[in-house]
Curated annotation (Swiss-Prot):
Belongs to the CTP synthase family. CTPSs have evolved a hybrid strategy for distinguishing between UTP and CTP. The overlapping regions of the product feedback inhibitory and substrate sites recognize a common feature in both compounds, the triphosphate moiety. To differentiate isosteric substrate and product pyrimidine rings, an additional pocket far from the expected kinase/ligase catalytic site, specifically recognizes the cytosine and ribose portions of the product inhibitor. GO terms for cellular component: cytosol. Its EC number is 6.3.4.2. It is an enzyme of class 6 (ligase). Allosterically activated by GTP, when glutamine is the substrate; GTP has no effect on the reaction when ammonia is the substrate. The allosteric effector GTP functions by stabilizing the protein conformation that binds the tetrahedral intermediate(s) formed during glutamine hydrolysis. Inhibited by the product CTP, via allosteric rather than competitive inhibition. ATP binds at residues 14-19, 71. GO terms for biological process: 'de novo' CTP biosynthetic process; pyrimidine nucleobase biosynthetic process. UTP binds at residues 13, 186-191, 222. Pathway: Pyrimidine metabolism; CTP biosynthesis via de novo pathway; CTP from UDP: step 2/2. It comes from Zymomonas mobilis subsp. mobilis (strain ATCC 31821 / ZM4 / CP4). This is CTP synthase. Residues 1-265 are annotated as: Amidoligase domain.
């Protein structure tokens, strides 16, 4: 039977529960344990798919087509275990399922209540499909005391009794703020957070204390005394230069040992973390650097492109270079902005990421044109590929009125709504006036690469599988004029109906992909497209 580690947060949000969970999972894996990480999100949205990127950040898509929290990206990158739909649950989805059961009469006339119906649903989710695991780590979103999270806190309290006290450990992440005026670290917020947690019936076994300054031994003893945990289970968590240093820091402070000890597992075998040390060394001691501009719509919140940022870092790791990312608002390239050309001229490569809606689209097209004309390495992802096709249609294929039907009626809809596609041998269909949530082409789909193409060489394969999240696609009826304009359709769906990759053979590095390769990139296994893109940027840096 799997053991469960429940991770809660206190004092403030955004302390890094997700990174802590991912780091702990990685350390347990290095000890040979089989792990899986799950996320409980207390918000009432069914999933984050329809939420604003500025509110939620990135939507992380799994192989099986789930739109999930960005923390699942950290889980997958650190552990290497592909996330699944069953690894993320929201209050919205729980209530949706419960209400559907009530409408069907499944509760046989019983009064449907938070306890036991909601809490039972949460417990079922936590325990589902865990028989082949050693540890299941469950992160509870939000902060202890939030009204929204109370059913989850109650559910994990019950699980300790259901599963047996030796099979559940509670890890609580808090903030130990530094008051500059007094020159002191303050432990009182942590004490109050633990008091709130214990008032709900949960005594934490391990305390992780985020702090900007080293936590003195006397303060650890004080926290241990007032929070009723062993001193060895008070783990300092200082800021790190890179998120890939975090597992090393946590191991040095004894997090994995404290958690195993709380389970009664006293394992003294030294841990070999050479893989993580190698990554840390490459990041700390690069042999060069490149500057890549990301021309996007949501650059005001970098979490909106979290996996993209990490994939570029992974490309830098593969090439032993530091990647400097310049975030550029696409709208600055619309009209005659004298600063626009200057901003692009200083870049070694240009990337246009995914997005939705018309705002900023002309700026993205202008950035594509600059990259094409000035032979700057260009990478278009999802909407970025579509903008590359519109730019090519207008400026190299003679289709001056080319646009996307996403932006309104068009005389030349080079980009159109896809209403049906094939998945696992079956046709999926969507209506133009259907719901927004969960109706896109989501999850992993195969593609066939053109023999001799640049992407076939990069992948070293003719067949690939990548993750998608889109409802618009390059209109196959414009394939011929676009190819006459210099674009090569080097990747297609197996049925030959959906363009997946375009490239320009007359350009040093110009590739557009309809999928999201950043979702599969990992520090120990950088995605080949990002590795090659950064290599192209490095080559460009030596030319300017």
């Amino acid at each position: 039977m799997a053991r469960f580690i429940f991770i809660t947060g206190g004092v403030v949000s955004s302390l890094g529960k997700g990174l802590m969970a991912a780091s702990l999972a990685a350390l347990l894996q290095e000890r040979g344990f089989r792990v899986r990480i799950r996320k409980f999100d207390p918000y009432l949205n069914v999933d984050p798919g329809t939420m604003s990127p500025y509110q939620h950040g990135e939507v992380y898509v799994t192989d099986d087509g789930a739109e999930t929290d960005l923390d699942l990206g950290h889980y997958e990158r650190f552990s290497g275990v592909p996330s699944r739909r069953s690894d993320n649950i929201t209050s919205g989805r729980i209530y949706q399922n419960i209400i559907a059961k009530e409408r069907r009469g499944d509760y046989l006339g019983a009064t449907v209540q938070v306890i036991p119906h909601v809490t039972d649903a949460i417990k079922d989710f936590a325990r589902d499909d865990t028989d082949d695991l050693d540890f299941v780590l469950c992160e509870i979103g939000g902060t202890v005391g939030d009204i929204e999270s109370l059913p989850f806190i109650e559910a994990i309290r019950q699980l300790k009794n259901d599963l047996g006290r030796g099979n559940v450990v509670f890890v609580h992440l808090t903030l130990v703020p530094y008051i500059a005026a007094a020159g002191e670290l303050k432990t009182k917020p942590t004490q109050h957070s633990v008091r709130d947690l214990t008032s709900f019936g949960i005594q934490p076994d391990v305390l992780v204390c985020r702090t900007e300054h080293p936590l003195p031994d006397s303060e650890r003893s004080k926290i241990a005394l007032f929070c009723n945990v062993p001193k060895e289970a008070v783990i300092p968590a200082l800021d790190a230069k890179s998120i890939y240093d975090v597992p090393l820091h946590y191991h040095a402070e004894g997090l994995d040992k404290a958690v195993l000890s709380a389970f009664g597992l006293n394992i003294e075998t030294p841990l070999d973390l050479h893989r993580w040390k190698e990554i840390s060394d490459r990041l700390a001691n690069p042999e060069g650097e490149v500057t890549i501009g990301v021309v996007g719509k949501y650059v005001g919140l970098q979490d909106a492109y979290k996996s993209l940022h990490e994939a570029l870092v992974h490309g830098g790791i593969a090439n032993r270079v530091k990647v400097n990312i310049v975030w550029l608002d696409a709208e600055m390239f619309e009209g005659n902005n004298p600063e626009a050309a200057e901003a692009l001229s200083s870049l070694h490569a240009i990337l246009v990421p995914g997005g939705f809606g018309e705002r900023g689209s002309e700026g993205k097209i202008a950035a594509v044109k600059f990259a094409r004309e000035h032979k700057v390495p260009f990478f278009g992802i999802c909407l970025g590929m579509q903008m590359a096709c519109i730019e090519g249609a207008r400026n190299t294929a003679g289709l001056k009125k080319a646009s996307s039907s996403e932006f309104g009626p068009s005389e030349e809809p080079v980009i159109g709504l896809i209403t049906e596609w094939e998945r696992d041998g079956e046709r999926e269909e969507r209506a133009a006036d259907g719901d927004l949530g969960g109706t896109m082409r989501l999850g992993a789909y195969p593609a066939v690469l053109k023999a001799g193409s640049q992407v076939a060489e990069i992948y070293n394969s003719r067949e690939i599988t990548e993750r998608h999240r889109h409802r618009y696609e390059v209109n196959i009826h414009y394939k011929e004029p676009l190819e006459k304009g210099g674009l090569v359709f080097s990747g297609m769906s197996p049925d030959g109906l959906l363009p997946e990759i375009v490239e320009r053979p007359d350009h040093p590095w110009f590739i557009g992909v309809q999928f999201h390769p950043e979702l599969k990139s990992k520090p120990f296994d950088p995605h080949p497209l990002f590795s090659d893109f950064v290599a192209a940027a490095l080559k460009q840096s030596r030319l300017v």
